[in-house]
Curated annotation (Swiss-Prot):
Lineage top rank: taxon: Eukaryota
Family: Belongs to the plant LTP family.
One GO-annotated biological process of the protein: defense response to bacterium
Name of this chain's protein: Antifungal protein 5
Keywords: Antibiotic, Antimicrobial, Fungicide
Further remarks about this protein from its record: Under low salt conditions, possesses potent antifungal activity but activity is drastically reduced under high salt conditions.
Disulfide bonds listed in the record: none
Keyword Ligase appears in the UniProt entry: no
Record function comment: Possesses potent antifungal activity against F.graminearum but not P.infestans.
Keyword Transit peptide among record annotations: no
Length: 38
């Protein structure tokens, strides 16, 4: 997995990581994609 792949997959989670609250659906999908790539 490259840094670029990680960045693109977690980009949807940035607002959740910065502000908290509920993660966006894109964040959950991106994390699942990373787990599948690993």
């Amino acid at each position: 997995i490259t840094c670029g792949q990680v960045t693109s997959q977690v980009a949807g989670c940035l607002s959740y990581l910065q502000r908290g609250g509920a993660p966006a659906p894109x964040x959950x999908x991106g994390i699942r994609n990373l787990x599948x790539m690993a």
